[in-house]
C-alpha cells in the first residue's frame, strides 16, 4: 500500500525551489556591480600601463624611428593682416603614433582619456616654425583628447589658435594672390629619431570647415600640403608644410581708389572745353585735381606695409597723376600764348581797328603850325586890306609821308586754341588705351596655386 506525501515532503520541495531561484539571482550581477567591476578593471589597466613607464624616453628608443602621423581640421581661418604680413588660424591639431609600452588587454579595445593622462606619457614636441604666437585653449578645461588602443597606438588632439607669418609679394596689389604657409615639426628630435607623415592622402590631410573662412578681403581658394627637410646647426629636421592659397577681392579698392582716380582724371579734362580766356575756372580745375590725386595716393598706401617697390595700384595712381598734371601744364601753355597775343593757334573774331594819325606840326619862327591842314580865313567881303594880309599869312603845306608801322599780331577773344582741340581727343584716347591695357594685363593673370617647396 502506497504512502501519501506528508507535510514534510511539501516543505522540502519549497525549500529546494527557493534555493534554486536564489542561486540564479546571485549568479546575475546587478548594473551597479558591473560598473564597479569596469572601473576597477579600467584603473588596474592604467596603473599597469604607467608602472615603470618613463615619459622622458621616446617610443622605440635605440630600436626604430618614431613615426608621427598628423592631420589638421581648420575651424576658423582669418583674419589676414597685410600690414603685419600674418594670419590667424584656429585648428584641431591631431597627432598619432605607436608606443609599445602602452599595450594592454582587457574588456575594452580603446581607452578614452583626457589631458591628465597626456601629461604622464611621452608626446611629440611639435612646434610651429613660422608661428608668432600659439595658444592652447584651456577653458573650461584644457582642450585635449587622448585615445589609446590595445595595440599601443595613440591619438592626441589639441585645439590651438596660431598666429603665423605669411610672406607677401605685393607687386600685383590689389589683384594679388598669396600662399600662406603653416610649418611645423619636432623641436628637439632630428629625422634620425622622429619623422612626421600625413595621416591621409594630401587632399584630405588638411580640411577647412565650410563656414570656417573669416576673410573680408580674400577668397580662400584651397590648400596644399608638402613635407621637406630643413638643415640646421644641430642636424636635419623633418618639416611639414601646409599652404593656404588666397586671392584678394578687388571690390573694395575699386570703390575706394580706382573710381575716384578715374573720375578725377575725367574732371581734369573738362578744362579743355572751356575758353582759354577763362583763367580762374581752368586754374581751379587744374589745382583741385592735382591736390585730389595727391590725397588719393597717400590714403592708398596707409593699409599697406612700407615696401620698397611699386604695386599695381601705385602704377595706376602714378599714371592718373601724370594725366592730371599734364592737363594743368596744357592750360599753362595755352594761357602763355594767349597773353602773348599770338593768333596762330586760334581764330580772330574781332579785328583790330586802325588808329588815327594826328597831323604833324612844324616849328617855324617859334610857332607851331599844322603842315597838312589849311584854314580858310573868315574875312569880310569887300575888305581888300584884310584879304592881302590873309593871303600873306597863309603857309604853304609841305608834303609829309605818313609813318609806316609794322603790323601788330592780331589779338583773339573768346577763341578756341588748337592745343585744346587736340587735347580733347588725345587725352581721353590715351587714358582709355591705358585702362584697357592695365585691366587686361592684371585681371587675366591666374593665381599661382603651387607654392615653393621647402628646402631639401
UniProtKB/Swiss-Prot annotation:
Superkingdom, natural source: Eukaryota
Keyword field contains Transmembrane: yes
Cytoplasmic side: 275-279, 334-421
Keyword Protease: no
Transmembrane segments: 254-274, 280-301, 312-333, 422-441
Annotated disulfide bonds: 166-180
Family to which the UniProt record says this protein belongs: Belongs to the ligand-gated ion channel (TC 1.A.9) family. Gamma-aminobutyric acid receptor (TC 1.A.9.5) subfamily. GABRA1 sub-subfamily.
PANTHER family: NEUROTRANSMITTER GATED ION CHANNEL (PTHR18945)
Name of the molecule in the record: Gamma-aminobutyric acid receptor subunit alpha-1
Organism: Macaca fascicularis (Crab-eating macaque)
Amino acid at each position: 500500500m502506497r504512502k501519501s506525501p506528508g507535510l514534510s515532503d511539501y516543505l522540502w520541495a519549497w525549500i529546494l525551489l527557493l534555493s534554486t531561484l536564489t542561486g540564479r539571482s546571485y549568479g546575475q550581477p546587478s548594473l551597479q556591480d558591473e560598473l564597479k567591476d569596469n572601473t576597477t578593471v579600467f584603473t588596474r589597466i592604467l596603473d599597469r600601463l604607467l608602472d615603470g613607464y618613463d615619459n622622458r624616453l621616446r617610443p622605440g628608443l635605440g630600436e626604430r624611428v618614431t613615426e608621427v602621423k598628423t592631420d589638421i581640421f581648420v575651424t576658423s581661418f582669418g583674419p589676414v593682416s597685410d600690414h603685419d604680413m600674418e594670419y590667424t588660424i584656429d585648428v584641431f591639431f591631431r597627432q598619432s603614433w605607436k608606443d609599445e609600452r602602452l599595450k594592454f588587454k582587457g574588456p575594452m579595445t580603446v581607452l578614452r582619456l583626457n589631458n591628465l593622462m597626456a601629461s604622464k606619457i611621452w608626446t611629440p614636441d611639435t612646434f610651429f616654425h613660422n608661428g608668432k604666437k600659439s595658444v592652447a585653449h584651456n577653458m573650461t578645461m584644457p582642450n585635449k583628447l587622448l585615445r589609446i588602443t590595445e595595440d599601443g597606438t595613440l591619438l592626441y588632439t589639441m585645439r590651438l589658435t596660431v598666429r603665423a607669418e605669411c610672406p607677401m609679394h605685393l607687386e600685383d596689389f590689389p589683384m594679388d594672390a598669396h600662399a600662406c604657409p603653416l610649418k611645423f615639426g619636432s623641436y628637439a628630435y632630428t629625422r634620425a629619431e622622429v619623422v612626421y607623415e600625413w595621416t591621409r592622402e594630401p587632399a584630405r590631410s588638411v580640411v577647412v570647415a565650410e563656414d570656417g573662412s573669416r576673410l573680408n578681403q580674400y577668397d580662400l581658394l584651397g590648400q596644399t600640403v608638402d613635407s621637406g627637410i630643413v638643415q640646421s646647426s644641430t642636424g636635419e629636421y623633418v618639416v611639414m608644410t601646409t599652404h593656404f592659397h588666397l586671392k584678394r577681392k578687388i571690390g573694395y579698392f575699386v570703390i575706394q581708389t580706382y573710381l575716384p582716380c578715374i573720375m578725377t582724371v575725367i574732371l581734369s579734362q573738362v578744362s579743355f572745353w572751356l575758353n582759354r580766356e577763362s583763367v580762374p575756372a581752368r586754374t581751379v580745375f587744374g589745382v583741385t585735381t592735382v591736390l585730389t590725386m595727391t590725397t588719393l595716393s597717400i590714403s592708398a598706401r596707409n593699409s599697406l606695409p612700407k615696401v620698397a617697390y611699386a604695386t599695381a595700384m601705385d602704377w595706376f595712381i602714378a599714371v592718373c597723376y601724370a594725366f592730371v598734371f599734364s592737363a594743368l601744364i596744357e592750360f599753362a601753355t595755352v594761357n602763355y600764348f594767349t597773353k602773348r597775343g599770338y593768333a596762330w593757334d586760334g581764330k580772330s573774331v574781332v579785328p583790330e581797328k586802325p588808329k588815327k594819325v594826328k597831323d604833324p606840326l612844324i616849328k617855324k619862327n617859334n610857332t607851331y603850325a599844322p603842315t597838312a591842314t589849311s584854314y580858310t580865313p573868315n574875312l569880310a567881303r569887300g575888305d581888300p586890306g584884310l584879304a592881302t594880309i590873309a593871303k600873306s599869312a597863309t603857309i604853304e603845306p609841305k608834303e609829309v609821308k605818313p609813318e609806316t608801322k609794322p603790323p601788330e599780331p592780331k589779338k583773339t577773344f573768346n577763341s578756341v586754341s588748337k592745343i585744346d582741340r587736340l587735347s580733347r581727343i588725345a587725352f581721353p584716347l590715351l587714358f582709355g588705351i591705358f585702362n584697357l591695357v592695365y585691366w587686361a594685363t592684371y585681371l587675366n593673370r591666374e593665381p599661382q596655386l603651387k607654392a615653393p617647396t621647402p628646402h631639401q
